[in-house]
Regions:
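C-terminal accessory segments of proteins
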Residues: 2-367
Length: 367
């Protein structure tokens, strides 16, 4: 059974090779998890193998970890997001599902319950959702907050490296011994005909994008609805979400990123960014070079002089008029020096809470 000395390693193994099941050996010691009936119950695609076959499936496994069995909750609602779908915190449904999963991990009474629940959930849930929720929980739980959490790029390099370079990396990993591998040069396929290519190095910089991902780990939007929680659970949720100076740091962080972006633009003979106008065309094009192998999709490009259009999807509806209204309300709140909370009580922004309140409301609740 897992002991305090190897809990850290076992949690780290849950993040490794996210598209391979837990009973496949991972890590330098070729360690696999020993599965049980509870695991197969929530992972029916492996049920045909049976417990004994799963636990002897990988002949290269040198160590088999047996996790203490504990009751596990239902993941039925969270399973609505398929494993092969993209995950984004800017989609309300995804955010809600992430909140529910964070709640599950956060409310586990001890490390045994957390490890077993995470092991069972890992191979049935969307890998990006699982990584996000477990990382948020581990960063904020008192018994795991001191554990080093692996970075997103270590286990999802396809989000940060183009497919060509990733294919070369896989070839080296499979065919060449670790001591004989050579660095892979990531070439920039750019053209002078598109001015936006001059700043590709900044927009798709690994550090900048990792910072954005990590920001949402440290400052998550929140968990599921508070109505069904006990008073203690509500207070615990507030400790995760309502951190001191969160709104102020949100504003400062974005101000600094824009300042650096404008600096890079000036260094590349480009003008500073213009104020966003929801009704006008955007002059510059944008052609991202990255995608994601799991979904087989590339990020959508933006052609020159493109205008904002309504988005009407089954699970994600956004209308330009609505966005413009929210933007106008933010400006109005700033100009009037007050905002109206849910109880319709004016709250002046003359206090220290001013920037905190504004920065806290802007990310997900502009209205």
């Amino acid at each position: 059974y897992a002991t305090m000395s190897n809990f850290k390693r076992n949690f780290h193994l849950l993040f490794e090779r996210p598209h391979q099941p837990v009973f496949i050996a991972k890590g330098p010691k070729k360690t696999a998890f020993k599965v049980c009936e509870e695991y197969l119950k929530v992972n029916p695609r492996y049920k045909c193998l049976g417990v004994s076959h799963c636990n002897s499936f990988d002949k290269n496994a040198e160590e088999l970890v047996e996790v203490k069995r504990t009751p596990i909750p239902s993941f039925d609602e969270i399973l609505e997001l398929k494993r092969d779908e993209n995950f984004s915190l800017f989609i309300p449904k995804h955010r809600r599902l992430a909140g529910k999963l964070i709640d599950i991990f956060w409310n586990m009474p001890d490390l045994d319950h957390l490890l077993f629940t995470a092991m069972c959930a890992r191979d049935c849930l969307n890998p990006y959702l699982f990584h996000y929720a477990l990382t948020v929980a581990m960063l904020h739980r008192p018994d795991t907050k001191d554990m080093a959490v692996p970075t997103f790029v270590e286990f999802f390099p396809d989000k940060f490296v183009d497919a060509k370079a990733l294919a070369e990396l896989k070839d080296q990993a499979i065919l060449i011994s670790e001591n004989s591998r050579k660095p892979i040069e990531v070439t920039e396929e750019v053209s002078d005909k598109e001015v936006e290519h001059r700043l590709m190095y900044f927009r798709e910089d690994m550090g900048v994008n990792l910072h954005h991902w990590h920001w949402h780990l440290v400052y998550p939007h929140g968990t599921s609805d508070l109505e069904d929680k006990t008073e203690a659970q509500v207070e615990a949720t507030k400790k995760i979400v309502d951190k001191d100076r969160r709104g102020e740091l949100f504003y400062y962080m974005h101000q600094q990123v824009i300042a650096r972006y404008n600096y890079e633009r000036l260094c590349n003979d480009l003008k500073k960014t213009k104020k966003l106008d929801w009704t006008k065309e955007i002059e510059e094009a944008y052609f991202p070079k990255l995608g994601t192998l799991k979904t087989g999709m590339s990020y959508a490009a933006r052609v020159a002089n493109q205008k904002f259009q309504d988005l009407d999807r089954e699970e994600d509806k956004r209308y330009v008029d609505e966005l413009k209204k929210w933007s106008d309300q933010i400006y109005a709140a700033i100009h009037h020096g007050s905002v109206i909370d849910v109880s319709k009580t004016p709250r002046t922004v003359m206090h220290r809470l001013t920037i905190r309140l504004l920065g806290t409301r802007m990310p997900y609740q502009p209205h």
